[in-house]
Amino acid sequence: FLLGAANIPPHPLNLINFMEMIRYTIPCEKTWGEYADYGCYCGAGGSGRPIDALDRCCYVHDNCYGDAANIRDCNPKTQSYSYKLTKRTIICYGAAGTCARIVCDCDRTAALCFGNSEYIERHKNIDTKRHCR
């Protein structure tokens, strides 16, 4: 079993950070994984119009990462950053305008948005070809 685990690529550090932010902001009965295939934009890719407020959070996050990727040498999916979870909010550290700070702010904004948006069960695992045009 352990030898097989060695072949599993590690999660990028910022994905782990983002998952921790989400866990901090969402109701305890939901796991971060329940957001991975929700609506038209939560999860890999995205198309069409967001189907609700929660999906809109993911749409904004995707666009934020797209903007960050336009910064020289900035890969938002692998960029590490520093942050603190405190008093029901998230604080990002680092100089404004740096890749790390921008990516942290993208994740922070999305996680807080998730915490303020209703999770609608029927929008999980939707037929994206039909609903996301």
Curated annotation (Swiss-Prot):
It catalyses: a 1,2-diacyl-sn-glycero-3-phosphocholine + H2O = a 1-acyl-sn-glycero-3-phosphocholine + a fatty acid + H(+). This is Basic phospholipase A2 beta-bungarotoxin A-AL2 chain. Ca(2+) binds at Y41, G43, G45, D62. GO terms for biological process: arachidonate secretion; lipid catabolic process; phospholipid metabolic process. InterPro entries: PLipase_A2, PLipase_A2_Asp_AS, PLipase_A2_dom, PLipase_A2_dom_sf, PLipase_A2_His_AS. Snake venom phospholipase A2 (PLA2) that inhibits neuromuscular transmission by blocking acetylcholine release from the nerve termini. PLA2 catalyzes the calcium-dependent hydrolysis of the 2-acyl groups in 3-sn-phosphoglycerides. Its EC number is 3.1.1.4. One of its GO terms (molecular function) is calcium-dependent phospholipase A2 activity. Keywords: Calcium, Disulfide bond, Hydrolase, Lipid degradation, Lipid metabolism, Metal-binding, Neurotoxin, Presynaptic neurotoxin, Secreted, Signal, Toxin. Gene3D superfamilies: Phospholipase A2 domain. Expressed by the venom gland. It is found in: Secreted. It is an enzyme of class 3 (hydrolase). PANTHER family: PHOSPHOLIPASE A2 (PTHR11716:SF100), PHOSPHOLIPASE A2 FAMILY MEMBER (PTHR11716). Coiled coil: none annotated. Belongs to the phospholipase A2 family. Group I subfamily. D49 sub-subfamily. The active site is at H61, D107. Its main location: secreted. One of its GO terms (cellular component) is extracellular region. The keyword Signal applies. Binds 1 Ca(2+) ion. It comes from the Eukaryota. Heterodimer; disulfide-linked. The A chains have phospholipase A2 activity and the B chains show homology with the basic protease inhibitors. Residues 6-13 form a propeptide.
